[in-house]
Amino acid sequence: MACENNLVVKQIMDLYNQISNLESLKPSKNVDTLFRQLVSTCLPTDTNIDVTEIHDEKVKDMRSHLIKLCGEAEGYLEQHFSAILGSFEDNPLNHLHIFPYYNNYLKLGKLEFDLLSQHTTHVPTKVAFIGSGPMPLTSIVLAKFHLPNTTFHNFDIDSHANTLASNLVSRDSDLSKRMIFHTTDVLNAKEGLDQYDVVFLAALVGMDKESKVKAIEHLEKHMAPGAVVMLRSAHGLRAFLYPIVDSCDLKGFEVLTIYHPSDDVVNSVVIARKLGGSNGARGSQIGRCVVMPCNCSKVHAILNNRGMEKNLIEEYSAIE
C-alpha cells in the first residue's frame, strides 16, 4: 500500500510539487529535467506499490492531478517537436529521431503489432486512432514498419494538432496517401466506428477513471462485433504517470492480453475484442471480473453471470 511515508512516493510528491509550481509546462530546460526525473523515478518495476490500493487521500489526489499535468506537458512536447519537424524542407519523417522518445515509440509499435498479430487472423485494412495528437507516432510507426498496406484514420478534437500532424506526412509519397486526419470528437459520433478492424484509444483520451470508462463504453456501443480495441494502461509506479485500464472496465469486450513492459516503454498494452462476432460469442455471458494472483504475474479470471464457467485472460509481465 502506498502512503506519504513511502520513500519513492515522497520523491514523486516532491517532484509533483515542483512541477505544479511551474509557470508553464511548455518545453524548457527546467520542465524537461523535472519530467525526466519523474519518469526515471516511476520506471522501476521491482516495487510492491499498487496505486489501486492507495487509501491516503492526499496521495490519491496528487496522482490524479499529476496524470493531468503529465498529459498537458506531453501535448506541449509533441506540438513543439511536430512544428520543428514540419519546418524541414525535405521529408519530416526522415528526422523523427530528434524526438526524445522516438525509440520508445518504435518499441511500443513493435510490441503492439506483435500482440495484434497473435490475436487476429488477417491484416487490418483500416485502423482508427482516437486522440492521435500533433505527432501521431503510433500510426506512423505501424504504417511505416509493420502495416504497409493499411489505411490509418487519425481522429483528434484539436484542429491545430491535426494540421501539425498532417504536415508531418504530407511530403511522404506513401504515408500521405494512407494517413487520413479527422477533426472531430469521435466519442460523440454515433456512426463510422464500425468500419474499422482495429481501434486504438490513446492514453490521454480519458484522463480519469470516469471519462476513460465513458470512452470505452462509447467504443463498445459503436464498434463492429469482432473488431479489436487496443488501449494504453499503466502498472505499478508508472500509474502515477498514466491512467489504469482494468479488464473490469471493458464490459462488452473479451480481454485478450494485458502486457506490462519492464523496460523504458512506460505504457502497458491492453488488447480486447468486441463481443458479438464469431470470435466473441463464447464471452457473451461475461459478468464480473476477479483478479487472481499467480507466481509470475497476475491472471484475470472472468466469471459469467452465473459464476460457474471461467475464461482465463492472459496478463503477463516482462519481469519474469
Swiss-Prot record:
The answer to whether keyword Cell inner membrane applies is no
Which keywords fit this entry according to its UniProt record? Answer: S-adenosyl-L-methionine, Transferase
Q: What class of enzyme is it?
A: transferase
> According to the UniProt entry, what is the EC number of this protein?
2.5.1.43
An annotated Gene Ontology molecular function: nicotianamine synthase activity
Superkingdom assignment: Eukaryota
Cystines in this chain = none
Family the entry assigns = Belongs to the nicotianamine synthase (NAS)-like family.
What the protein does comes down to: Synthesizes nicotianamine, a polyamine which serves as a sensor for the physiological iron status within the plant, and/or might be involved in the transport of iron.
Record's protein name: Nicotianamine synthase 2
